[in-house]
Each structure stands twice: as structure tokens, then as C-alpha cells.
Amino acid sequence: MDGDSPDIEEVFNLAEKFGAGVMVDEAHGTGLTGENNLGQAQQFINHPNCVAIIYPLGKSAGLSGAFVVGSKMLKQYLINFSRSFIYTTGPSKQLVIQLR
């Protein structure tokens, strides 16, 4: 890894051109890039081709776990079909406090 990042605007332009969805993993951008340090993709959260933005907490946040930002439909899908969500425990109180 050498710190490269894609032209995220071009990625979304291509997705729009070809009718594709975009999922962005912000493992290394959160806290460092983008408006309010929320990563590069934050500005595209309402873009029609944005399927999900994934924020892993084990890298730049120094915590554990992750969260996903997406549509209500994606939320319902993950609640009902994501095995790693269904068969796990909730985050600890300390983890939630650290995340805030």
C-alpha cells in the first residue's frame, strides 16, 4: 500500500454511465480525507449509484467492528441476510463511547 486513492468522482461517473452500483470501503480514508474527515465517498452518499459506504473501525479509528451507510432497502437486507450481523453480539458500551 502506498497511499494511492482513486478519482472517486470518475468512479461514480462511470457507474452512472454503465448503470452500475458503487460500494466504497473507507478503511483508510476515514479521519484523513474528505469533507469533515469522513472519507472520500461521503460527498456521494446521496448519489443514485451509491449502494453503500463501509466504514471499518479497525484501521484509522483504532477500534473494532464496522458500520455500513446505505439505503433503507440495504439496511433491511443486511438485517435479514447478513450472517455476520445476525450471529454476533452488539458492540460493548465502551466501544460505543469511544466511537462517539
Task: Give the label of every model feature segment.
Residues 18-24, 28, 33-100:
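Active-site C-terminal subdomain of aminotransferase-like
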Residues 1-18:
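Active-site core of PLP-dependent enzymes with the aminotransferase class I/II
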